[in-house]
Amino acid sequence: MSQFPLSILKTSQPHHQPKSMNAPRSSDARGKRILIDPIDDRISKLPDDVLVMILASLSTEDALKTSVLSTRWKNVWKQVPYLHFDLLSATYESGLIAALSNSVAESITQVINNHNGHLMGCSIHHFAHHCVNGVLENWIRLLTLEKNTRFLSLCNKLGKGRRTNVLRFSPNTFSHPKLATLFLRRYDLVTAHAFKECENLKILKLEGILAEVDVFNTVIASCPSLKVLVLNCMWYNEKTCLKIHNNNLKVLHLDCPHVDCIDVSAALLDIFSIFYFAFAKEQNFVIKAPRLLFNNWTKDLEKVPNMNYNITSHAQEKKNIGHEFVVSGDASYLQKLKSLKVVVDVTNSREVHMLRDILVAWNGVLEELHILFKDNNVPNSKEDSESSIGGTQKKKWEEANLFPNADFRVEVMWMFDFNGSNKKQFALASRFVTQGTVMKKMMIKTSSFFANEKLDNEAVVAKLKELPKGNENLSIECF
């Protein structure tokens, strides 16, 4: 099971939009009951845990419908680990949205109350008026205090104008020790009270959030255990500095236009991405993140939305929570980025696998890919070594296996610390040439080497130029 099941909830929905739980049945369904011949009903003979796995792949509404199949199925849905409610998918008559959506909201409350045991995750898409009538806060209370929900995603239908989606929650609303992941979308935050003492949160994603910069600073400071932080925010006051000081942070994404100043200090930050910013002064953007080896921040900010990822550093972690988040559907910003800079040791099979993951997740054409090669001379794990001996590592570069896949393309590729004598580095570069992965230009830095090494690398570059090119107009150059 993915570490981020809320993404799975989205992808497990049927291709058609489900009807509201209160929507009328079609004419051919009225008055009919679904009957199952007990002789042929082999599925019902399966144990509960298997049936729960089957229901977990359905939408919550479809899982609920199985309760009418037979007494055997009546309570099975109550054990599913994830719930997903979308009030926006229902069809409402004009002028009756509030009344009808409140009726659906009551049904949601009933479903949560009737569910047995704890929940791994829950997502709710609701209307703005649920923010002010106590319904949303009641859902959160039920999900955190009674269901011990670990993953919670709340999305509000955009209200009409400023201050229409205000979250006014009690202090410590999100501080339940079991709550580890929180996604909030389209809200106004007046205070940070709900985040008081949120040492429990490991992942926080704030999208379309409107608040004072000082409120954001308080929220971030109240969550010292964060490993993943995504900010897509707007503010009322621009002339204030956004401060992100966190020594546990692994992933940081910033999409906060018009802020006057950003101050980041994150000793363990491995993955940093940012959208366009236009600071009045270069000094208005300060980042202290020693693991990020590409540090031309001023030029990057003026260029394109980009990501900086130290794969070598992140691969040393026992749990790659940052990597898993970025390659999941929850990092919805990924494909909007235009440039990727990675640090990777291609002799390490785990790092190669992580490189493949991030490129596949991009799923399209990247404007620029920068690769800083590392040669750590650190032996792989026993599992990696055995797979390399058995040929698994070799298969990554075989012609029958496209790397990373058939869809990924990059217009311009830059290589730093390229060692021509390293067979794995040469194999990767040659695959990108022959597959047509690089569309316009491949740039290989040789100027930083000593004279004899420079000549050796330039000779290797000459070999790359002789390879059959997947793109005839590809230019391969040294710099």
Swiss-Prot record:
Top-rank lineage group of the source organism: Eukaryota
Classification via InterPro entries: F-box-like_dom_sf, F-box_AtFBL13-like, F-box_dom, F-box_plant, LRR_dom_sf, LRR_FXL15/At3g58940/PEG3-like
Start and end residues of each F-box domain: 40-88
Pfam families referenced in this protein's UniProt entry, alphabetically: F-box, LRR_At5g56370
Stretches that traverse the bilayer: none
Protein name: Putative F-box protein At1g67390
SMART domains for this protein: FBOX
UniProt source species: Arabidopsis thaliana
